[in-house]
Amino acid sequence: MKKHGHLNRDIARILASMGHTDSLVIADCGLPIPPGVECVDLSLKLGQPGFIETLDSILADFQCERAVFAIECRQHNPAVQDKAERMAQAGAALDFVSHEEFKQRCQAARAVIRTGECTPYANVILHSGVIF
């Protein structure tokens, strides 16, 4: 049994397979998952696990070069906006796009990790960086 990192075998596999600029979505429970994009559904019940908790866990094991958020989070979800700002301070480039554009960009993702988050616009597209 693994002692460190992600115990979820699908998440561990996806993170290990990511290459430079590949994208991974962390989503709330309402984001539509595009057909053909792998979904790892972590949702247990409304609010669990949360978006930020899940994002923090992924970021502990993932080199994020760029993060894309829906611009609507600035007005409707201050916690997500605050997290975006902290990611920028840690060195990730940020993009903000309309929620409709965000959903279109999800079609190119390697996978979507669906959380139980039930606050608006709690979604991010993470683009993989390199560790060297």
Swiss-Prot record:
GO terms for cellular component: cytosol. The keyword Isomerase applies. It holds the Pfam family RbsD_FucU. GO terms for molecular function: D-ribose pyranase activity; intramolecular lyase activity; monosaccharide binding. SUPFAM superfamilies: RbsD-like. Its EC number is 5.4.99.62. PANTHER family: D-RIBOSE PYRANASE. Catalyzes the interconversion of beta-pyran and beta-furan forms of D-ribose. This is D-ribose pyranase. It comes from Chromobacterium violaceum (strain ATCC 12472 / DSM 30191 / JCM 1249 / CCUG 213 / NBRC 12614 / NCIMB 9131 / NCTC 9757 / MK). The lineage of its organism: Bacteria, Pseudomonadati, Pseudomonadota, Betaproteobacteria, Neisseriales. The gene is rbsD.
